[in-house]
Amino acid sequence: MGKRDNRVAYMNPIAMARARGPAQNSGPTIQDYLNRPRPTWEEVKEQLEKKKKGSRALAEFEEKMNENWKKELEKHREKLLGGNESSSKKKEKKKKEKKKSSRLSSSSSSSSSSDSSSSASDSEDEDKKQGKKKKKKKHRSSRKSSSSSASESESDSKDSTKKKKSKEEHEKEKDGKNHHRKRKKADRGDGPLSSESLSGPDQTEEVQVKKKKSNEEKEKATDKAKKRKKHKKHSKKKKKKAAGSNSDLE
């Protein structure tokens, strides 16, 4: 089996461009752009003057708007001036009416003073009556509150006594059950602890003390045994060293 031919034909781009020949003209060239027709300086001046003047229609519109605006300003001024005059007239009328009312009030004040004195005495009597009623209501409310607080305290004390009784009964039941269980264990013959279990919660502390003492004695015995073993090992090492030294001397 032969190898596959992976060669590619190389084409020189410059030679290909020469073979195509000169490129066709597409669109205007640079020379055409440079040789374009241009306006003279006089024509440019005329165009600038026209721009400064602006259009006639716009100028007419601005004139009309200015005229309308001036008319509206005049109307507004007239309204404001008329309103100021009318307001001044109204103020004068109000002043005159106040003067008349003050004169009438001065004449009526003398008559009203006597009426006010009688009304003041009546109002004082009413205030005293209302004060007495309020005191009575407060006294009643205080009595009710004291009676309600006493009843609440009694109910709380009853509840507390009931709770204490229920707790005591529950503890007694627990003690009875524990005593019954210990009796059963003693009947079965669990050993020397049966007599101690029958003696109740008072001897539990003694049992704990005995256990602590026994544990301490066991620890002491173990410590003594360890010390003896260490002493024996040390004495054996000394004997070996002494025997080795004697053999060397011989």
Curated annotation (Swiss-Prot):
Bias-annotated ranges (Basic and acidic residues): 39-49, 59-80, 155-176, 214-224
Disordered: annotated span: 18-250
Biased composition, class Low complexity, residue ranges: 103-121
Comp. bias (Basic residues): 90-102, 130-143, 177-186, 225-242
InterPro entries referenced in this protein's UniProt entry, alphabetically: Fam133 (IPR026766)
Domain of life: Eukaryota
Family to which the UniProt record says this protein belongs: Belongs to the FAM133 family.
Protein name: Protein FAM133
Organism of origin: Gallus gallus
Gene: FAM133
